[in-house]
Amino acid sequence: MKKEAASCDYIICADGGVKWAITNNIDPDMIVGDLDSISDTLLFYYQRKNIPIQSYPKDKDETDTHIAITIALQKGASEITILGGIGNRMDHSMGNILLLIRIAQKGVKAKLVNQNNVIFVSNKRIFLDAEPGNILSILPYGDNVKIHQTYGLQYPIINRVLPIDFPFGISNIITEKQAWIDIESGWIVFILVKE
């Protein structure tokens, strides 16, 4: 994840993300959130470095990650990478996956990355940036999700609906360097497993 962060032009830490940033010697460009996961010592450290900090109330509709994404979109981001947004809190992890759709609906490319997975969404043809042998799970987001055709997968999917209650798209395997998936309708959540 440190390599991913180093390739970013602008880093917004959502609350507790600053703990990861300081551990990995990465200075964020901005810190946002209700700041309930940051010690006063850490806040003071970043204030002394003149890093902008935007504090929000604890009682709010948006998560701290949602706020960070909104700011990134307002700043004109063309691509958003959410680091560490998959963790012990399944509710936050699921919420962050749903935020990928919000970002994509704005026409911005986005992915959610942790040590083991890269998660992204699409509702149109997508070319995969992965190596043969990588595991790819293909999950529908909602009803009426249909794949027109796939290329470069061990288990091809051709003109098939992906039922929300029968996840047959789990653990497919990429077989070609130029793999792609042509989505006919609906949104799909892709999980690329890093092993």
Labelled PLM ranges:
Residues I51, Q74, R102-V108, D143, ...:
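Generic secondary-structure signature for well-ordered alpha-helical cores
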Residues S122-E195:
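Long, charged alpha-helical interface segments
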Residues R89-S93, I119-S122, I157:
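Short, well-ordered, mixed-charge alpha-helical segments that flank or form enzyme active sites
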Residues I97-E131:
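A contiguous pocket-lining binding segment that forms or flanks enzyme active sites
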Residues E4-Y10, G16-A104:
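Acidic/Gly/His-enriched mid-domain segments of enzyme catalytic cores or analogous surface patches
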Residues D9-Y10, D29-M30, I51-P52, E79-T81, ...:
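Structural motif
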Residues Y56, V113-Q115, T150:
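Conserved beta-strand termini and adjacent loop/short-helix elements that scaffold enzyme active sites
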Residues D15, L83-G84, V113-N114, L139, ...:
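Short beta-strand segments
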